[in-house]
């Protein structure tokens, strides 16, 4: 699973995913990319599930770039615990994704466009947000 090796604070404030992304909105590495159409938190398990779906479909002929990383820890208190007495233990790690961010990029060594599009489609089904598949150079 993806998670930071070390953080400055164990329990940071929750970051907002509202609004548009300021940078990282262009496809740089691959031929096709998966762009977020709405904002949300994406957990490290969801990122890993999308990565596995893409790499299994592409096999050894393709390359996958992951442009998001779960830096933010979300805390949760145990069940049936009274209010107060602290914030709770870090439960999961999430990446803050805003609208317009490029999440994944793929390129196939055999130049099989069908395989690239299918890999991104499979990955999009593993994510909790609406996404759009875009070709390099065609996004605004």
From Swiss-Prot:
One of its GO terms (cellular component) is cytosolic large ribosomal subunit. SUPFAM superfamilies: Ribosomal protein L16p/L10e (SSF54686). Coiled coil: none annotated. It holds the Pfam family Ribosomal_L16. GO terms for biological process: translation. One of its GO terms (molecular function) is structural constituent of ribosome. InterPro entries: Ribosomal_uL16, Ribosomal_uL16_bact-type, Ribosomal_uL16_CS, Ribosomal_uL16_dom, Ribosomal_uL16_sf. Keywords: Ribonucleoprotein, Ribosomal protein, RNA-binding, rRNA-binding, tRNA-binding. The keyword Ribonucleoprotein applies. It comes from the Bacteria. Binds 23S rRNA and is also seen to make contacts with the A and possibly P site tRNAs. HAMAP family: Ribosomal_uL16. Part of the 50S ribosomal subunit. Belongs to the universal ribosomal protein uL16 family. This is Large ribosomal subunit protein uL16. It comes from Phytoplasma mali (strain AT). The gene is rplP.
